[in-house]
A protein has these predicted regions:
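Poly-acidic low-complexity segments
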Residues: 4, 15, 67, 129-132
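Generic structural signal for well-ordered, non-membrane alpha-helical segments
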Residues: 1-2, 22-37, 64, 68, ...
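Catalytic alpha/beta core of large soluble enzyme barrels
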Residues: 61-62, 74-81, 86-217, 222, ...
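Acidic, glycine-enriched catalytic cores built around paired aspartates
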Residues: 227
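Alpha-helix capping/termination and helix-coil
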Residues: 9, 40, 44-47, 161-165
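Internal maturation/activation junctions in enzymes
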Residues: 14-91, 183
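Core structural elements
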Residues: 1-12
Length: 234
């Protein structure tokens, strides 16, 4: 899987869910998928394929047919060690160990927010800043992205993953039941492997909560033009 995807793309000048972002994501996911399968072929050459492997049935599967031709040829030659290889995990906590890069395929929840940490003696609240913002790059945050755009990114990544994808689709506080229902129907129609929605005005106090008051992080926010590399700073 991946983490930090949104930060990486936006530091190359591609705002989340834009055409450039989607093209960047497809390149990343193609490389990830193909080389995961290639590595599993190398293991199969050494240790054998997984017990239920049937070459004909496996190579006829819809997902395997999307692999690059050189990977399919390698499977024919070597077999494959693992039945499943790719997923997009919920990496919110893991990403904190890398200075709070954007988690998984998610956009930053906010440029800075309060994170609730449960402990034996209660809980504490920590102020957390988005990594890209501290490096001077202005990112689109989760609540600035429409539910439709969230869903498009989810559907795009799902094509390259053979198991599950963790992706939250943020919906507005005024979303009605029919709109909410249609989001799940569209996810199914697009072939998504699951969908999670989040409405900030829910009854439960969230683990992550956007800060609406207080000082702005001390970083100059810039947009990077991917064609020229020039920065336009606020």
């Amino acid at each position: 899987g991946v983490t930090g995807l949104a930060n990486a793309a936006e530091m190359c000048g591609h705002p989340y869910a834009s055409k450039g972002f989607n093209e960047f994501t497809e390149k990343v996911m193609t490389e990830l998928r193909d080389h995961c399968y290639s590595a599993s072929c190398d293991l199969a050459r050494e240790k054998g394929s997984f017990p239920l492997y049937d070459e004909y049935q496996y190579l006829q599967s819809k997902f395997v047919k999307t692999l690059s031709p050189w990977v399919q040829d390698k499977i024919k030659e070597c077999g494959i060690r693992n039945s499943h290889l790719t997923s997009i995990a919920p990496t919110g906590t893991i990403s904190l160990t890398a200075d709070n890069v954007s988690s998984g395929i998610e956009p930053p929840y906010s440029l800075y927010y309060d994170r609730t940490i449960q402990q034996f003696d209660g809980h504490t609240v920590q102020r957390v800043e988005d990594y890209a913002y501290t490096q001077g790059v202005s990112s689109r945050t989760a609540n600035e992205i429409s539910a439709k755009e969230h869903l498009e990114v989810l559907a795009l990544v799902s094509k390259y993953v053979d198991s599950a994808v963790s992706k939250t689709c943020n919906v507005g506080n005024n979303v009605n039941y029919q709109e909410f229902k249609e989001l799940y129907t569209q996810a199914w129609e697009l072939g998504c492997k699951g969908i999670t929605t989040f409405r900030a005005a829910g009854k439960r106090y969230g683990i992550l909560n956007e800060v609406v008051e207080g000082d702005t992080p001390k970083a100059e926010a810039c947009f990077i033009d991917p064609a020229t590399g020039q920065k336009e700073c606020d």
